[in-house]
Amino acid sequence: MVRLAAELLLLLGLLLLTLHITVLRGSGAADGPDAAAGNASQAQLQNNLNVGSDTTSETSFSLSKEAPREHLDHQAAHQPFPRPRFRQETGHPSLQRDFPRSFLLDLPNFPDLSKADINGQNPNIQVTIEVVDGPDSEADKDQHPENKPSWSVPSPDWRAWWQRSLSLARANSGDQDYKYDSTSDDSNFLNPPRGWDHTAPGHRTFETKDQPEYDSTDGEGDWSLWSVCSVTCGNGNQKRTRSCGYACTATESRTCDRPNCPGIEDTFRTAATEVSLLAGSEEFNATKLFEVDTDSCERWMSCKSEFLKKYMHKVMNDLPSCPCSYPTEVAYSTADIFDRIKRKDFRWKDASGPKEKLEIYKPTARYCIRSMLSLESTTLAAQHCCYGDNMQLITRGKGAGTPNLISTEFSAELHYKVDVLPWIICKGDWSRYNEARPPNNGQKCTESPSDEDYIKQFQEAREY
């Protein structure tokens, strides 16, 4: 009640003062008895206003559109516009002077105050301005009090942005799960089984939360996910990497078998049909061709059909040359090896597995490789190369590799009939077999074995 009474008294005093000044200006009698009495009344009202202002120093009121224009004109004309002091009213959060949204009132933007004189006395009136936050309300960031620092105080919007930034950073750089599959069957004699350094079977999930890129204890990080298979059909390979220390990255690869490429059977259908005549079919059986009293191996060697001549010519021109040393990359997966004679890359794969039976068909060989078919191939043949314990190419003798007229990649059955069965017919006499299927040494590698060992092997084959 005291506060309301003080405000009413203040408003009444201002109204009377305004009316009095208006009357004085209209009459023009500034030195008469009435003027003296008016001056006394004005002094009395001014004293009352000062008393009321002292007792209600914390009183504030809101400027509204309904305030009389004369009151605003008089206030602006005789009093300097005060620097705004902002208070927190009950239920209405008003901005304090220290907040980044505080601003100075721009008089030209207010029609009622545009002509105000701000050089008069200040009646010590406090003005509370309420600013409602909204998308269209922006603070004046260019004006700051003299004693304020150049940076602004964090606002709730800034805090929300910081939380969103932290969540995005965590999503991009941390808390990633890596699936590790240790049950894949892709190991061979040069590649230890996958997961040898992890004892838990099946799938494991590695969490990299709050860890550096690599483990400082053993110098190895977690394996990345396997890459996409390098081919969409046929035989390809996949790779994955992990950190092994500073400026060190370990790479691991494995084979991935996709469905056969469409069209390869159609591409080689004619050749497969013609070659099947040599292997045996309902119309022609190679084993029945030879009589009991004839040398079957000799008959096989002397069979020189026009198709076979043309086919062998294509084989010699189509197949790559054997590398002089065993390419160790084929032990892990199929590999592309550049052929300097053909001037292009050829895909190779390891052929040293148990099913190759090297101890029977290639007794002195330790490793063998076989070229792979491609859509550019004009035949179904594959180059077959074998290597000794020193990983050097065996160019002659019983351990040397010979071209396969039918690749096992196309048909294992036809390969057996065309390439393996003649060796059986010749009773393992590699000297005659290699005469019909000479080993490849297109890159002019060092002859192996030595002349002495080769002559010894040749004599043993003849005596057998």
UniProtKB/Swiss-Prot annotation:
Tell whether Isomerase is among the UniProt keywords: no
Compositionally biased spans, kind Basic and acidic residues:
66-76, 138-147
Per the record, GO CC terms? Answer: extracellular region
Describe the location of the AMOP domain by residue ranges.
Answer: 289-452
What are the entry keywords?
A: Disulfide bond, Glycoprotein, Secreted, Signal
Which Cys pairs are S-S linked?
A: 229-256, 233-261, 244-248
- Location, primary (coarse class): secreted
Output the superkingdom of the source species: Eukaryota
Question: Which portions of the sequence form the region Disordered?
Answer: 50-98, 135-155, 173-219
Q: Give the sugar-modified residues.
A: 39
**UniProt xrefs under InterPro entries:** AMOP_dom, Angio_Inhib/Adhesion_GPCR, TSP1_rpt, TSP1_rpt_sf
> Domain TSP type-1, which positions?
218-262
One BP term from GO: negative regulation of angiogenesis
Could you tell me which SMART domains the record lists for this protein?
AMOP, TSP1
Compartment list: Secreted
Question: Where do Polar residues bias regions lie?
Answer: 51-63
Q: What is said about the domains?
A: The C-terminal AMOP domain plays an important role in the anti-angiogenic function of ISM1.
Protein role: Acts as an angiogenesis inhibitor.
The record's similarity note reads: Belongs to the isthmin family.
What PANTHER family has UniProt attached to this entry?
ISTHMIN-1, ISTHMIN-2
Assembly and oligomerization: Interacts with integrin ITGAV/ITGB5.
UniProt-recorded name of the protein: Isthmin-1
Q: Can you name the source organism?
A: Homo sapiens (Human)
